[in-house]
Amino acid sequence: MDETITNKIKNLNIKWEYEPFPHTVIDNFLPSNNFKKISDNLKLINNFKDLKKNFSTHVEFNKKVYGDKDLSGELKIPVNILGSKLIKNIFEKFLNVKNMISLADWENYGGYYPFHSMNTGGVLGAHVDHSHSEDDLLHVANAIYYVSDKWDESWGGETFFSNDIGTKIVKKIIPKPNRLVLFIHSSQAFHGVNKISSPSDIKRNTYYMDYYIKDSEFIKMIDNQKKNIGKSLNYTHHTTTFIPLFPIGLKSFEIKFLGMKNTYKYILKYMQYLIARFIFGYQFSGFLKKLFTKKN
């Protein structure tokens, strides 16, 4: 990795904020010349072929997820950085854990690919991500790096953080070019993307990374949260779970949602999440997951 980039990251002044859950926002993350090369190369995004997912439901709309076959040269740099020990160290220090694992440590990123692009009309409703990887590592942190070459505040598209049940937006973060957002993930870390109203030729481009720990680090992490932020965050076992009828707050409800077939898929997952979080808890939901996995 470029020594200039390494030194810049090592000398970052990290200031954590704690509401609605721990996060930090870092502007001018990469040196300006590196960022310009990345954003300039992304102007060829319409030629990308390695499309993995294309979302078109009312809670996941106008969002495309790409693999890394198109991410050569400068475009691979953010993936390498976000998956590196440099960023892991920031999270490990905050959480008091060791041996953190990122998506970049797995073949095909564990199926959660690192480059996302959204365009006008796009929205990503309030949700919590999957709680565990396929091999049962606990998902504890996320990184989002904004790489559009320009973004006007009037275009929306903010990353938003919601209250701990996902029904009210508490904070919005503008996807400012060359801005990095790090946040601690838990079963109450509802987040999403506000509706985008950018010009049709302007895309909201981001790099994304998840971070995981072994269960053996769990108790130590919880104890550290109590000391550092005065409370422990909530963890249980669940898949990625959206707020099915109120994607960007209570006022976003539309009667047409009730007539959409996929709404009921989201409702089922949300009910499973609520039971796991508020009735079963971490240990028992984990026991049930292992029990049913063995049976299948």
What are the language-model segments listed below?
Residues 3-4, 13-95, 233:
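Non-heme Fe(II)/2-oxoglutarate
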Residues 25, 114, 142, 206:
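Amphipathic alpha-helical recognition patches that constitute DNA-binding helices
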Residues 46-48, 98-101, 148-153:
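Proline-centered turn/helix-capping motifs that create local helix->coil transitions or kinks
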Residues 82-138:
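Non-heme Fe(II) oxygenase catalytic core, chiefly the N-lobe of the double-stranded beta-helix
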